């Protein structure tokens, strides 16, 4: 039986990670290791100035006093006697599409699995209701990856529309869309009258054209986007060579 490490960024007690573990336990030996609090927006951050503390919960899940990336790194390096066959992160409560992926702890947990050499996927529900739909597609995709894995230098970022399973139209391979910049900060006061700020909501879709993750989900499809950690803008290399040459000549 394959071994799957499960993590997330919503916290080890979140509905999504429970649903994901229940689903994948049908075909795999699972180890669920998640942060002891909500770490949404943690991206690839690591805990460098404090020790990590573990706590095994009544359901067998392990909570970690760190980030999603910490959880995956610690689990693979210290908790497994043998290595897992795959890392699956989710089910996130809310979309991780377009620019969201830069901030997402869900995506980061999968990326850490990839850094350590394992196939990895991140799965998000674009809403907060139909976790069983996302769990169904997680199981379906993991089964497919058993037989036909993708390159280990990539992860799959999956976003599932918040619909009953019977209403989902299928799956599509997509590229990342893009959002407009986020709305302004929310300024308010704490109980002592001191000024405080909250991050505003994310921006609306800027690029939700055909072929993007936004377009697929909006039209009732599961989006599957391959991601890589190489952020090099290859199409700019030649132009920047010319730019640098002009600087050097002055």
From Swiss-Prot:
Which reaction does this chain catalyze? a ribonucleoside 5'-phosphate + H2O = a ribonucleoside + phosphate
Alphabetical list of HAMAP family matching this protein: SurE (MF_00060)
Per the entry, which co-factors are needed?
a divalent metal cation
Q: Which Gene3D superfamilies match?
A: Survival protein SurE-like phosphatase/nucleotidase
Decide whether keyword Cytoplasm is in the record.
yes
The similarity comment for this entry is: Belongs to the SurE nucleotidase family.
- Could you identify this protein by its name? 5'-nucleotidase SurE
Q: How is the cofactor bound?
A: Binds 1 divalent metal cation per subunit.
Give the E.C. number(s): 3.1.3.5
GO MF terms here are: 3'-nucleotidase activity; 5'-nucleotidase activity; exopolyphosphatase activity; metal ion binding; nucleotide binding
GO CC annotations, alphabetized: cytoplasm
Q: Which SUPFAM superfamilies match?
A: SurE-like (SSF64167)
Q: Which UniProt keywords apply?
A: Cytoplasm, Hydrolase, Metal-binding, Nucleotide-binding
Tell me where in or outside the cell this protein is found.
Cytoplasm
- Function description: Nucleotidase that shows phosphatase activity on nucleoside 5'-monophosphates.
Enzyme class comes to hydrolase
Where a divalent metal cation is bound, by residue? 9-10, 40, 92
Q: Do the record's keywords include rRNA processing?
A: no
């Amino acid at each position: 039986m394959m071994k799957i490490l499960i993590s997330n960024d919503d916290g080890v007690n979140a509905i999504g990670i429970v649903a994901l573990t229940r689903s994948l336990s049908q075909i795999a030996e699972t180890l669920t290791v998640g942060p002891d609090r909500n770490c949404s927006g943690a991206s690839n951050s690591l805990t460098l100035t404090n020790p990590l503390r573990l706590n095994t919960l009544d359901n067998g899940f392990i909570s970690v006093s760190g980030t999603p990336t910490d959880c995956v790194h610690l689990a693979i390096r210290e908790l497994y006697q043998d290595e897992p066959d795959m890392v699956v992160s989710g089910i996130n409560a809310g979309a991780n599409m377009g620019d969201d992926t830069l901030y997402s702890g869900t995506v980061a947990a999968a990326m850490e699995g990839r850094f350590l050499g394992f196939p990895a996927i991140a799965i998000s529900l674009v809403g907060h209701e139909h976790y069983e739909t996302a769990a169904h597609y997680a199981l379906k995709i993991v089964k497919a990856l058993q037989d036909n894995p993708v390159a280990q230098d990539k992860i799959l970022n999956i976003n599932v529309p918040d619909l009953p399973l019977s209403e989902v139209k299928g799956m599509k391979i997509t590229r990342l869309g893009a959002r407009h910049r986020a709305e302004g900060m929310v300024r308010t006061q704490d109980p002592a009258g001191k000024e405080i700020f909250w991050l505003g909501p994310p921006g609306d879709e800027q690029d939700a054209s055909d072929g993007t993750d936004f377009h697929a989900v909006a039209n009732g499809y599961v989006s599957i986007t391959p991601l890589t950690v190489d952020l090099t803008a290859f199409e700019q290399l030649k132009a920047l060579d010319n730019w640098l040459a002009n600087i050097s000549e002055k």
